[in-house]
């Protein structure tokens, strides 16, 4: 699926929902247009906030032959370019920013989604067999299975046999869920209902792994299960969300090739509202073809 097809899908779905089409996240040619790439600076400062846009725009190359080329390159990407060297080693500010981004990534893996936040969204909360974050990181197999209490809660509080079941899980990034939730779940649910699909009760799974959607689909009898889960964070990017969609999942028979994945959902990648429109179209095609993953007709 190319960018033009994605834009057509977004335009069609958002129009049917009566909403404005979101602006694309493509780079602009105007100076300073990308929010993550502020105006480049060359001064090295001990007082600089290492997580700020100014720090990300810092240029560490001393006495460049073509400063304008470095400035344009620095504006064009959020990657670690133009950081300069001190002999064979990175400059102090570049190293400190690397360490700060690494620390931020570790923090988002270890953080918990607050129970108050889940309640504020009006979501039913269930758990996998995991009891704490340490066990979640060391026993991924237990994160693929619901706890007995969770199974009972789904059977008693969720709509059975839906066309589409939407599930939210913390995964490996708490920030991915809390930062993108309001911009992806409401338009996703609205788009699915606008398409005439029977949508199940959305709920939150704490300590969930991707394969847990197979058991959820089997218990609820869902035709399509859509799991929104936090991605493993990269350096300086802790808000990236993934969507794993699967048709008629079964614990014993569903394999990874049966899943369709849309990744890199965040403001600096695929905008959440745009991703919601693409997921709606994907769910419709899965139901039409009765397939997902590599079994879908492209």
From Swiss-Prot:
Names of required cofactors: adenosylcob(III)alamin
Record InterPro entries: EutC, EutC_C
Keyword Lyase carried by entry: yes
Enzymatic reactions: ethanolamine = acetaldehyde + NH4(+)
Gene Ontology CC terms, in alphabetical order: ethanolamine ammonia-lyase complex; ethanolamine degradation polyhedral organelle
Gene3D superfamilies: 6.10.140.690, 6.10.250.2060, Ethanolamine ammonia-lyase light chain (EutC)
EC number of the protein: 4.3.1.7
Protein's cellular compartments: Bacterial microcompartment
Keyword terms of this UniProt record: Bacterial microcompartment, Cobalamin, Cobalt, Lyase
Cofactor notes: Binds between the large and small subunits.
Record-linked Pfam families: EutC (PF05985)
Top-level EC class as recorded in UniProt: lyase
Self-association state and partner proteins as the record states: The basic unit is a heterodimer which dimerizes to form tetramers. The heterotetramers trimerize; 6 large subunits form a core ring with 6 small subunits projecting outwards.
Protein family (similarity comment): Belongs to the EutC family.
Protein name, per record: Ethanolamine ammonia-lyase small subunit
Organism of this sequence: Salmonella schwarzengrund (strain CVM19633)
